Amino acid sequence: MKQIALDIGLAPEPTLDGFVAGRNAAALQHLRLWSESAARSPVPTYLWGPEGAGKTHLLRAARAQLLAQGADVGWLDIDTPPRTPFNEHWDAVLLDDVHLYDTELQHTAFNWFVNAVAPANGRARPVLAAGLLPPADLPLREDLRTRLGWGHVFELHVLPESEMRAVLRRAADARGVFLSDEVMNFVLGRFSRDLGSLMQLLDHLDRYALQTQRA
């Protein structure tokens, strides 16, 4: 079996196909239909759940799907410069880690949300958002919090670690990759713990092992 080193670089870009749904099948199916449809409903969607449930994976995967279709996408997270204006060319707005937004980012998120869903002129655009808590419990201004709960709301669940390790071990064995306990602990401690991201990382490790074998 192929041995792998710990110097594995960055995890690959998430995809919807790479997300292992588990108890999150309804949310995944919703996002598949949402991102693949040419006429997306402007009804907002909000994903919530604990760290490692796959919220950012799904948002980034949905964004990648939209970009591949030639869409323009507005993306807001804690690294976005405050007061970034809404862009009329956007086809969708994605808001990640909303529970971390400070006052200025909340102002920006509210501005983007209103301009997307209820524009003064032109077509409405969908909003996809994610956070740690259900909408009613978010530490946000009330007008933003209530809007995030307007539409489709999905709670995401994390796989138990024992199941996660078992799935990764089976997937590694199927690829002929020897995944030692040391590497397993490193991966689970260093990278996003949602299973979709981890499975894609395993593909990355497999390619890395092949490259180092050839070197």
Where would I find each of the regions flagged by the language model?
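Post-Walker A helix-loop "phosphate-sensing" segment adjacent to the P-loop in P-loop NTPases
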Residues: 64-76
